Amino acid sequence: MRLLERLYFPLRKPQLIQVPIRPLARPYLYRPAAAMDLSTDATERKGSVHHDTHATPPQFIQKEHWRYQSMRKADLDTDPNIFDLSKRDEFSEERKDIWRPAGIIPAAQIDAACQAYARGKPLSVPAQDAQIFEHRDFPGLQVISGLLPPETQVLFTSCLMHRDLADPGHKINLQADYDIPYPPKPTSDGLRFDSSFFLRQRSDPDDCLTPKLPDKLKSLNNEQFLYTKLRWLTLGEQYDWPTRSYAKHATPFPEDLSTLVTGLFPHIRPESGVVLMYSAKDFMPVHRDVSEQCQRALASFSVGCDGIFIMARGEDDGEGENAPRSVAIRVHSGDVVHLTGNARWAWHAMARSIPSTCPDYLANWPAGTPGSTAAEEKTYKKWKGYMGTKRINVSCRQVWD
């Protein structure tokens, strides 16, 4: 696998990545963001970001990244430096002051967005108002716990992992090295997933991904492909990992996913989505999302197992407002991290995925796929429990002004 590709998708733990040290094109300066505003122009800024896409992260955030990677699972539950916003009601007053209410997404808006995503099917359990919390010292870092209802999470996972993964127009990390026998095109554009890699046998010697350089790589059966080798999928505008830029010729962004994102966050017009698949020992290195030409906010959706998300501001030797500081957040299935203002361009990472934390309503997926026939469900049961081992993160962003 190419080194540059490996730097920006889930990696196996533990391995030290050596990257060339080069100075920033200009120092990263923290400027306090304005008050929370989810209007269309809230995240517009004059000029261009001009961040160096190959800059090296500060040492202090890399040390935090490795600290959480090596921490025992049991210690994650008691670490006082990790914020779990699903338990904010249990916070001390001091900790509550760190995460302040920054707005609400009304229940009616959530219901409407999820119903539109499900092609008009209403939620079986009406949504509740979703509180937005913003970090006091990281303006623009906002978390909405449990924004996606359980049934929407199941549909969300099905659309991504059945339909979108089976579409060769959406790139995956293995396309450069393997010839991939994609399933036939779906026969329906509704909520029927009759074209999927999960409708194949787990281990069939006649149904494999064949390497383009057979003297260097081995063939992969479907189980090896889906459980261990699949790391990322790109939707819409195709992000090029080696150059860290976007191609000029767009692949259409999934229309239903666009409807969901815009329904929840009207100020974002999603044009690209990076889907990352984490297993128990996978992590995302420290990086910044600075390749987009547009200055709009980014919405990052999580489904599956919990993860530890970290963010940093400041520099190793900075002082005052530029002093080094970091924050760690435990994100759950259904949570959304919304990055706007200066937080949109901050260093961040997914330090680890936490195994055996996927909620019961999703853990057995693809068993229980919406709209499946009896024959399809029989095949899905052979893959039962796939999502119980996975964490999927989908960051939806607008690329162009």
Question: Where do the protein language model's features map onto the residues?
Answer:
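Non-heme Fe(II) oxygenase metal-center motifs and adjacent flexible, charged/small-residue loops
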Residues: 8, 19-401
